[in-house]
Curated annotation (Swiss-Prot):
Keywords tagged on the record: ATP-binding, mRNA processing, Nucleotide-binding, Transcription, Transferase
Pfam families: Pox_polyA_pol, Pox_polyA_pol_C, Pox_polyA_pol_N
UniProt GO BP: mRNA processing
Keyword set includes Amino-acid biosynthesis: no
Assembly and interaction partners: Heterodimer of a large (catalytic) subunit and a small (regulatory) subunit.
Gene label: PAPL
Enzyme Commission identifier(s): 2.7.7.19
The protein, known as: Poly(A) polymerase catalytic subunit
Class in the EC hierarchy, top level: transferase
Similarity comment: Belongs to the poxviridae poly(A) polymerase catalytic subunit family.
Top-level taxon: Viruses
Length: 472
């Protein structure tokens, strides 16, 4: 009886009123969580937010009274919830905030150990002309006349960049970056826009960032999970302007990804980024944008090539080039590539153009020789059985004739296979060298036909702190 009274008191304190019988029956199972929220030290939290404000939002006017008011209003929000679903959303978000904010975002205001600026000194200009020639050979489709929808950038982005730069240094075991921001550390000629990151705790991180922005600025932030990309979450402001995005990956994947440390932060090994860039260029809309982005892409490609040549000891004067045979099965939407020349742990690879077909194969075959899922890093699983690799190719496949696959797609397919080898650190030497040297053989081939990529099904799910919605 004493325990029941104690539970009732805790729920009553949380709601600021007597719970209904339904509320009591549901909330009594959450009483430990509720008790922690009731006992949360809002005064300490206030001082922590002030430190974040002074470090990351210096130019913003914010009085202590207004900040305290916003904190009090949010931690009283459950008292005004009309529906049980909203009450649960409030409680879940409050629980995440009180249990993770300090170690996720709060720590960014503490003194960081001194570090020395470091970079890899390579002569990237030597690859600039080669990169120009490679991209010129890829410039084989007309620019699209369709106006592409590009996300509008929120005015909050500058603040978030400062937070992300600090976060990458403090949380290097759970977060690493890739893309133009990471490559800027290798070659300062590379301009960057977004800071692209992979994380093992993306959901918790983004919720805490959303709360920080809410308390400091009063702005509404929405987190949108996109079904078409693996564990991809976008952050929008109240006008759907883009704030940031991130991919979530498992800790196992994070540990496997080859990475290098520059300025106390980890970046995805540029060889992995090179292979993903070559792979992505098989996507028709990327080729349609090539002319408009030529200079920017050329600097990036030249940097990635020079790093890969140096780090993986690739002799460019060797006469050995890519020797693979590729064949499309139009009805089954499957491409078979023969890798017989190379000493791999398989002889050929089936690239499914529909992900569901790969998943069917994996589910029907429990006795696989090898299996890996690198999630968003490769956007596919890899399975090996009886000297054959099975994987999924997520981009458009280009044809040079009715029955011949275009060299751009052959390079992309090879890159996709190589991602498996470079990440697992085995059997990549000869194939990687041949691919890099083959890129330098300029052959401008028109695109005869485009095999579309598969269409993903699903719906967007959201987390909206302001509206008390949590659907992912």
């Amino acid at each position: 009886m004493e325990r029941s009274r104690q539970v009732y008191y805790i729920i009553n304190e949380y709601l600021g009123r007597h719970p209904s019988s339904t509320e009591y029956q549901v909330l009594k199972h959450q009483v430990e969580k509720i008790s922690k929220i009731n006992n949360f030290n809002k005064e300490t939290f206030f001082f922590l937010l002030k430190k974040n404000k002074n470090k990351f939002f210096k130019d913003l006017e914010l009085s202590d009274d207004l900040l305290k008011k916003r904190i009090d209003e949010y931690f009283s929000k459950q008292k005004h919830a009309k529906r049980l679903g909203n009450l649960f959303a409030i409680m879940e978000l409050q629980k995440i905030l009180i249990s993770s904010f300090t170690k996720t975002i709060g720590i960014l205001t503490t003194k960081v150990p001194e570090y020395y600026h470091s970079t890899i000194k390579l002569e990237y200009s030597s690859m600039e002309k080669i990169a120009d020639d490679i991209l010129d050979s890829y410039n084989v489709v007309e620019p699209s006349k369709e106006v592409k929808g590009r996300h509008k950038v929120s005015d909050l982005v500058g603040h978030v960049y400062k937070i992300m730069e600090e976060y990458l240094r403090r949380h290097s075991n759970s977060c690493l970056c890739y893309g133009s921001y990471s490559l800027h550390f290798l070659n300062n000629k590379i301009e960057y826009g977004d800071i692209d990151v992979l994380q093992t705790n993306a959901r918790t991180f983004l919720i805490n960032i959303a709360f920080l922005i809410k308390f400091i600025t009063g702005r509404r932030i929405v987190l949108l999970k996109v079904p078409f990309l693996k564990n991809y979450v976008i952050m929008h402001d109240e006008e759907t302007n883009h704030v940031m995005d991130t991919f979530n990956i498992r800790e196992k994947t994070m540990n496997m990804i080859p990475k290098i440390m520059i300025d106390n932060m980890y970046i995805v090994d540029p060889c992995i980024q090179l292979l993903n860039m070559i792979k992505m260029l098989s996507q028709i809309d990327r080729l349609e944008e090539l002319q408009a982005k030529f200079e920017k892409l050329s600097v990036r490609l030249g940097t990635l090539l020079e790093y890969t040549r140096y780090r993986y000891s690739i002799p460019l004067d060797s006469e050995s080039i890519l020797e693979v045979r590729a064949k499309l099965d139009k009805d089954k939407r499957k491409i078979t590539v023969d890798f017989k020349k190379y000493k791999l742990n398989y002889i050929k690879c089936y690239f499914y153009l529909d992900e569901v077909e790969l998943k069917k194969f994996i589910s029907k075959n429990s006795g696989l020789d090898e299996y890996e899922d690198f999630e968003a890093v490769t956007n596919s699983e890899y399975a090996i059985r009886n000297k054959t690799m099975y994987t999924y190719f997520s981009n458009t496949a280009l044809m040079r004739s009715e029955n011949e696959i275009h060299p751009i797609t052959i390079n992309a397919l090879t890159s996709h296979a190589l991602l498996y080898h470079v990440i697992t650190r085995k059997f990549y030497d000869d194939l990687l060298g041949d691919l890099v040297r083959s890129l330098m053989i300029v052959e401008k081939v028109p695109v005869f036909k485009i095999i579309p990529r598969d269409k993903k099904q699903g719906r967007h799910t959201i987390i909206d702190i302001e509206k008390d919605i949590i659907f992912h």
